[in-house]
């Protein structure tokens, strides 16, 4: 026999699965810059390899970070555009780390090279995420740049070689699902 009363009791006063916790604030994925060295066909941002008016300066970014900390935001993912095109990216990351944020860098990976890998490692990002959209041909087609896959992969390998926690991000579409 099915007794609804026991189910109603459980719904009205459920058995806790663990101790009650106050969740931390939200994860903030912050598009610090619109400029990008790529023109990916699937990107939501209308980007180009040029500066755009109206972007926040370093001091303004720092003020926003103060506000985010006051709102108990625990995680900042620095994104764009391509955040490595921002001259103050390492200053921003350094301040965020000093403030106690978990700091991630979201990059297309093509600009991670010998000229900046030491600065990336020194910035002590908690995570560097590099987007790949498939294997070589598919990725380069999405990115509209021949050689983008090889450059991104080289950036991933440089990070790994210096002990930077790095990972691949893959957005599956009908055009690249077979590459997964």
Region annotations inferred by a language model:
Residues 102, 155-179:
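Conserved strand-turn element in the central/C-terminal portion of the radical SAM core barrel
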Residues 38, 137, 166:
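Glycine-centered loop/turn positions within well-structured domains
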Residues 86-87, 92, 99-102, 106-108, ...:
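Short acidic, glycine/proline-enriched helix-loop-strand junctions
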Residues 53-56, 120, 140, 144, ...:
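Pocket-edge positions in alpha/beta enzyme catalytic cores
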Residues 56, 87, 147, 175-178:
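Residue-level signal for the nucleotide or nucleotide-sugar donor/cofactor binding architecture
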Residues 2-127:
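Conserved alpha-helical substructure of the radical SAM core
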Residues 83-85, 109-114, 129-145, 174-175:
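Conserved radical SAM core fold
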Residues 60-64, 92, 116, 148-158, ...:
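A general structural detector for well-ordered alpha-helical segments in enzyme core domains, enriched
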